[in-house]
């Protein structure tokens, strides 16, 4: 069987405190919007 990684992305994490929120919801990757 060909196993491929699954990414559960926390999208638009714009503040440090949001990282824990997204990880607690099951995210295993974080997408930030930096300008």
UniProtKB/Swiss-Prot annotation:
Location(s) in or outside the cell: Secreted
EC class (word): lyase
A GO molecular-function annotation: lyase activity
Gene Ontology biological process terms from the UniProt entry: killing of cells of another organism; lipid catabolic process
Tissue spec: Expressed by the venom gland.
Taxonomic lineage from the root: Eukaryota, Metazoa, Ecdysozoa, Arthropoda, Chelicerata
One cellular component (GO) term of this entry: extracellular region
Cofactor: Mg(2+)
Catalysed reaction equations from the record: an N-(acyl)-sphingosylphosphocholine = an N-(acyl)-sphingosyl-1,3-cyclic phosphate + choline; an N-(acyl)-sphingosylphosphoethanolamine = an N-(acyl)-sphingosyl-1,3-cyclic phosphate + ethanolamine; a 1-acyl-sn-glycero-3-phosphocholine = a 1-acyl-sn-glycero-2,3-cyclic phosphate + choline; a 1-acyl-sn-glycero-3-phosphoethanolamine = a 1-acyl-sn-glycero-2,3-cyclic phosphate + ethanolamine
Function: Dermonecrotic toxins cleave the phosphodiester linkage between the phosphate and headgroup of certain phospholipids (sphingolipid and lysolipid substrates), forming an alcohol (often choline) and a cyclic phosphate. This toxin acts on sphingomyelin (SM). It may also act on ceramide phosphoethanolamine (CPE), lysophosphatidylcholine (LPC) and lysophosphatidylethanolamine (LPE), but not on lysophosphatidylserine (LPS), and lysophosphatidylglycerol (LPG). It acts by transphosphatidylation, releasing exclusively cyclic phosphate products as second products.
E.C. code: 4.6.1.-
Record PTM text: Contains 2 disulfide bonds.
Signal peptide: none
Family according to the record: Belongs to the arthropod phospholipase D family. Class II subfamily.
Top-level taxonomic group: Eukaryota
Cofactor mode of binding and number, as noted: Binds 1 Mg(2+) ion per subunit.
Active site, per annotation: 11
Keywords of the record: Cytolysis, Dermonecrotic toxin, Disulfide bond, Hemolysis, Lipid degradation, Lipid metabolism, Lyase, Magnesium, Metal-binding, Secreted, Toxin
Residues at which Mg(2+) binds: 33
Protein name as catalogued: Dermonecrotic toxin LrSicTox-alphaI-1
Primary location recorded for the protein, binned into one broad class: secreted
